[in-house]
Amino acid sequence: MLGTGNALVTECYNTCFLIEDRKQWFMTDGGGGSAVLHQIKHAGADWMAIRHIFVTHKHIDHLIAIIWMVRMICQFMNHGDYPGDACIYSHKEVLDLIRDLANKLLLSKETRFIDDRLHLVEVHDGETVSIIGHDVTFFDIRSTKAKQFGFSMDIGDGRKLTCCGDEPYNDCEEQYVKNSEWLMHEAFCLYSQRDIFDPYEKHHSTVKDACELAEKLNVKNLLLYHTEDRNLAERKRLYQEEGIQYYRGNLFVPDDLESFEL
């Protein structure tokens, strides 16, 4: 986990993560700035080895760091220090924004590699793409705030990892979420603190909500992210104490830079 926090956190980084298999890396979202490079470094990864990036939606706590990745990739390509290609996957709205921001903010000697060796790959609802040797099926979560996609990855032996983006589960996602080996789902705050953080008016959920969902849909491992950071030192303990009241599977509340074996 490169980051685990929501948009306005200051004590941890915005939610984004890496999946690695046989030294191949798949990155989902980037957070809000150049600190993503720090997070990648301290996660023990090489940014240059991250050849596949997925962006869920256009909100700046997910998108802006992707422009830094575009800059790094294209700058090193221009210097002759980046062999091969890279891909950024998303829906059309996000890809158009990335292309527009890059052309306005970066040098033409760098942006000339976009759509040549840095491929902006549009994905559609229900489309499956092979990424780092795994079938990844992207799906529209039907957000009412900004068009957003999640994904479900085949991780072998009939198991799947499903990421719902940063909004509560929608019934249209059932075929992807149900029976997942791993579910990555947002939990803005504790249910007991819902009157403090107002998650529902922000179209987010609580620990209780996410855990009840995972229990209902037979999820084996639930990982919560995109949280508040008011009491970060106690977040893991407090979230797990609330969550285990509603969920009998394995509940994970990661810190930034924490990793898990899938």
Regions found by a protein language model. Name each.
Residues M1-A43, K147-D166:
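Conserved beta-strand hairpin/beta-sheet module of binuclear metal-dependent hydrolase folds
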Residues G5-A7, I60, I88, V94-L95, ...:
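Short histidine/acidic/glycine/proline-rich micro-motifs that form metal-
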Residues V9-E11, E122-S192:
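Active-site-proximal loop/helix segment associated with metal-binding centers of metalloenzymes
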Residues M27-G31, R51-H57, D61, H91, ...:
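Active-site neighborhood of phospho(di)ester-bond hydrolases with catalytic His/Asp-centered motifs
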Residues S34-A86:
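Active-site metal-binding motif and surrounding structural segment of the metallo-beta-lactamase
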Residues M69, I73-C87, K147-D154, D195-L223:
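P-loop/Walker A phosphate-binding loop and immediately adjacent motor/lid segment at beta-alpha junctions
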Residues Y82-K147, G156, F252, D256:
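Metallo-beta-lactamase
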Residues P168-L257:
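Cap/insert and terminal regions of metallo-dependent hydrolase folds
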